[in-house]
A protein has these predicted regions:
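Hydrophobic side chains within well-formed alpha-helices
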Residues: 9-12, 23-24, 52, 73, ...
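Short, charged helix-capping/linker segments at alpha-helix termini
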Residues: 2-3, 17-26, 36-55
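Sigma70-family region 2
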Residues: 17-18, 57-72, 91-92
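Structural recognition of an alpha-helix C-terminal capping motif at a helix-to-coil junction
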Residues: 51-58, 71-83
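Internal acidic/polar
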Residues: 2-9, 95-112
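A short, glycine- and basic residue-enriched loop/turn
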Residues: 21, 32, 46, 50, ...
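Arg/Lys-rich amphipathic alpha helix in sigma70-family domain 2
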Residues: 65-69, 79-100
Length: 112
């Protein structure tokens, strides 16, 4: 297996469970761009993409004790990212002030 394979992910996950924050940083570095690209297919706002990607990793870290390893780590992380993006989009639709604020920023940028 290569240094990028699931065996390495399983080892990193186990190290994180034992308190090794550096191992979690390695998982973030490994998957951050992939998660950002995934979220960008669902969300057009670049800042929101970054926020959702960051929230994905926060949620993954908090849920790591429940990760059973029945699927690849990235598969699990992918699902967290999709659910986090869906939740963010639903919140945007529910709160018209957020949408208005985002539109105002877009209008300001267009007139500058």
């Amino acid at each position: 297996m290569t240094a990028r394979g699931p065996d390495v992910d399983a080892e990193l996950v186990e190290r994180v469970r034992r308190g090794d924050m550096r191992a979690f940083e390695m998982l973030v570095v490994k998957y951050q761009r992939r998660i950002q690209r995934l979220v960008a297919r669902m969300v057009r706002d670049v800042d929101l993409v970054e926020d959702i990607a960051q929230e994905t990793f926060i949620r993954a870290y908090r849920a790591l004790p429940q990760f059973r390893g029945e699927s690849a780590f990235y598969t699990w992380l992918y699902r967290i990212a999709v659910n986090t993006a869906k939740k963010a989009l639903m919140e945007l639709r529910r709160d018209p002030l957020i949408v208005e604020s985002a539109l105002a920023v877009d209008e300001d940028e267009e007139t500058s």
